[in-house]
Amino acid sequence: MNSKDISSKKLTLQGFSKLKLDFNLSSSASPSMGATIVKKRRRKTHDTEEQDENKLLGSLTKKEQISRINAVQNAALLKERNLKEKEAIVKKDSIVKEDSNEKTNDRDSATNTSFKETGKEVLNDVSLVELIENNTDNEDNNKKSLKTNKDIYSKHSKRIIAQSIDDKIEQPSVFKQRFGIRNRKSEFTKGKNISREVIIPDEITIKELSIRMAEDSKSVLKMLKEEMGENYGVDGLVDPEVACEIVEKFNHTAKRVSGANKEKNLFFIEERESLPKKPKPPIVTFMGHVDHGKTSLLDAFRESNVAERELGGITQHIGAYQIITKDKKITFIDTPGHEAFTAMRACGANITNIVVIVVAADDGVMKQTIEAMNHAKAANVSIIVAINKIDRSQSGDVERIISSLPQYDLIPEELGGDVIVVPVSAKKKINLDKLEEAILLIAELMKLEAIEDCRALGWVIESKIDKAKGISATLIVEEGTLKVGDMLVVGTAYGKVRSMVNHLGQREKVALPSSPIEITGLNGIPNAGDKFVVVSSEKQAREIAEYRLELIKEKKEDLSNNNLDMFSRNDSEVEELSVVLKCDVTGSIEAISNSIDKLGKDQVKLNILHKAVGGITDSDVLLAEASSAVILAFNVKVDSKIRDLAKRKGVEIHTYSIIYELIDDMRMYLTKMLKPVTREVRIGSASVRQIFNVSRVGNIIGCYVSDGVVKKDSLIKVMRNNKLIYEGKLKALRRFKDNVKEVGTNFECGVSLDGNVDIKVGDILEAHQLVQEERVL
């Protein structure tokens, strides 16, 4: 019986009996088809099953009986069709296997098509059941067809349909492709491993190592635990040697790169020989003793008045300027002449091409003049001597200075050497043109050239913190072209160039060789004299800066360990003055630090707890309070709020604008902290003339004071034939019968000494006194 016969006829009780008989016969003849469903559910014999069915059907209404029979019949038909389709699928699969050239995609497509057709047939069978139920309702009630209560049979029907679908879909790959589900992880892990070259730095975490190998961090941790017996966290640092072993176990190649390799060739310009070079302006540095007119001479070239604005009449920063003269550019660097700025002068000598040693005609060669000469000679740069202030010098001063230069290994042209000497006057602008010609002549002879088409490198002149700009640094480009947006590393600081301003305050986008430029964008404050270089990425800049910072940290730890024993031995004896130092620029910090460090002695020392560029902050005051320190502010303004806070906390703040005033005050502070020195001073002497034995008192020594004075609290030394036979204190000092405090020269006195002393006539008594003297640094 097919589905069309069932759907076209109404089923009566007589029809049901006949259908039941046919169904039982088919079930006994073919157990695998529909009968197994009933047996599986009830698990009874054929006779018992038939009785139970009659009983069950008798308890149901006519409508329910017909619906139950129709459902069972359709389930049997569905099972039979599914079996046939399953056999067809198996046959197709065998054909596909025999044909090795046929693509698997064709097979999947055919299977998917079969799956869709089967789904349609299942839906048709469900519709067939609903149609029979509707026909039965029309026969009994002659009303509109009513839908069957699906809640009674939905669970049973769903189980039959789901079982039929499961029988048809036995291949998981077909089901997964039908619904788009794939085991992506298994497919990924089965892929072919790629061998990589893994860079191993001095320090690396498990997470970073896993990323570089393109491996799962869990696999790395598991391997470490199982094969090496090590327990690590994902963010834990691993030894470089262990990291190399891990890389090799994952079939990769390890390349060990130490921090030193990061610095290697950092300042090397690739293809230097092939890149074109262009002439660059000379960098000229004015050096010399304090107040010899270096800044005034530079002002005469620049036609400005910087010297008049400088506090104390001395330069305390390195200044960089660029002027145009005779259609040629010259970059000038002005360095401080005070002895505290030795590091700045050394920095200026290393950066420059030409050094102009400025000597005042009335003072001649001084201490810092000699130091500047030594810096210039050590840097192997050309030297010009400018004898300034000739407008107020006396006759013969210039000749005297010229004749003294050879003793400093500077042979002037007047004496057959190659050092140009130019007498000038910055105030009267005398011979400035001759000095300018000398500079341009030497620059032309030196043939100064630089590559412009390469990454920039150069030097830091000075750095500071500005409230509006943040951290800024003044640079001199040595080679290459510096641009806004370049990533550079300088000392332990790095960052992207955010802005560039020239010495006139004008914004620039590029800076060529020998150009002084002020930049912003660094994450830290570099030191004057640090060398900068443009790098390819922020990662490279950060790694180099961190490596340098680590080196500095290691050096400090070594120094601390070496001095630990010394400090522990002397800690109880050494007085310490702690200070917090805040300055306007890094150059001032270095100069002041070096100067006040030299003030310390064995019994007193100055400890700089913290030094930084910028204004005084709340944390500075709190640090000073906790450490009983003094705050020194150099060229830094102090807010009223900070002063109030310091007053409440009992912290002293001393502000300075001239460096030697700060140094003098620190010397005075340390001097007051020094313990006075106790010295033994001879104050007089007396000769023994007679010895009296007094009962109940002892020996009384009769003396004559030959010089000085003998005091009652004097320390007495008894000398016999220039040998010390006794040292002690006076027990009593009398003149006649009266006790006196002292006896002067040419007077007689009687003394008694502590202890038993063998005194003879002719012995000499020397009177000494302990005197405390203030120490001076």
Curated annotation (Swiss-Prot):
Major place of residence: cytoplasm
Pfam families named in the record: EF-G_D2, GTP_EFTU, IF-2
Region G3: start-end pairs: 334-337
CC terms in the record's Gene Ontology section: cytoplasm
Region feature (G2): 313-317
InterPro entries associated with the record: EF-G-like_DII, IF2_II, P-loop_NTPase, Small_GTP-bd, T_Tr_GTP-bd_dom, TF_IF2_bacterial-like, TIF_IF2, TIF_IF2_dom3
Region of interest (Disordered), ranges: 30-54, 98-117
GO molecular function, one term: GTPase activity
Biased composition (Basic and acidic residues): 98-109
Compartments where located: Cytoplasm
Keywords: Cytoplasm, GTP-binding, Initiation factor, Nucleotide-binding, Protein biosynthesis
Domain tr-type G intervals: 279-449
Region (G5): 425-427
Region of interest (G1), residue spans: 288-295
CDD domains given in the database record: IF2_eIF5B, IF2_mtIF2_II, mtIF2_IVc
Ranges in a coiled coil: none
Binding site for GTP: 288-295, 334-338, 388-391
Region of interest called G4, as start-end residue ranges on this chain: 388-391
PANTHER family: TR-TYPE G DOMAIN-CONTAINING PROTEIN, TRANSLATION INITIATION FACTOR IF-2-RELATED
Record-stated family: Belongs to the TRAFAC class translation factor GTPase superfamily. Classic translation factor GTPase family. IF-2 subfamily.
Protein purpose: One of the essential components for the initiation of protein synthesis. Protects formylmethionyl-tRNA from spontaneous hydrolysis and promotes its binding to the 30S ribosomal subunits. Also involved in the hydrolysis of GTP during the formation of the 70S ribosomal complex.
Name by which UniProt lists this protein: Translation initiation factor IF-2
Biological source species: Wolbachia sp. subsp. Brugia malayi (strain TRS)
Lineage: Bacteria, Pseudomonadati, Pseudomonadota, Alphaproteobacteria, Rickettsiales
